[in-house]
Amino acid sequence: MKLHELKAAEGANKASKRVGRGTGSGLGKTSGKGQNGQNSRSGGGVRPGFEGGQMPLYRRLPKRGFKNIFAKEYAAINLDRLNCFEDGTVVTPELLVEKRVVKKVKDGVKILGNGNIEKKLTVKAAKFSKSAIEKIEAAGGKVEVI
């Protein structure tokens, strides 16, 4: 077989539906839209959520909650992700972004205690979980809240 002899697999290339090209095509006259009515018209159809005049679900249900504009969003990292650093490294949020451990710092970094840490690191972050502090100090490292 040569490159110029390559062919698509049987049934791989399907002709597009050409509607409104005569009754013999099977998709002529009404072009697969049924008889007359709102849905057969150009731009026809109802908006999303419309229930035929019945009070729609999104208006039947009560409003609930609010978005706290003062809420702080932290980039969370588990301890086992910090094993990529060498012994004695000072781990800062900027270094975490540089090494692509975290995409964005947001309002700070929070270190969580999932996994184990084998390296002696000085970790600087906005927040730490209790278990993370215990594990970092047990490995001989230091914790600094910034």
From Swiss-Prot:
Gene3D superfamilies: 3.100.10.10
Gene Ontology terms describing biological process: translation
Native source organism of the sequence: Clostridium botulinum (strain Langeland / NCTC 10281 / Type F)
A GO MF term: structural constituent of ribosome
Keyword RNA-binding on entry: yes
CC per GO annotation: cytosolic large ribosomal subunit
Family membership noted in the UniProt record: Belongs to the universal ribosomal protein uL15 family.
Known role: Binds to the 23S rRNA.
InterPro entries: Ribosomal_uL15, Ribosomal_uL15/eL18, Ribosomal_uL15/eL18_sf, Ribosomal_uL15_bac-type, Ribosomal_uL15_CS
A matching Pfam family: Ribosomal_L27A
Protein's name according to its UniProt entry: Large ribosomal subunit protein uL15
Alphabetized UniProt keyword annotations: Ribonucleoprotein, Ribosomal protein, RNA-binding, rRNA-binding
Subunit annotation: Part of the 50S ribosomal subunit.
Region entry Disordered, spans: 1-56
Gene: rplO
Biased amino acid composition, Gly residues: 21-35, 42-52
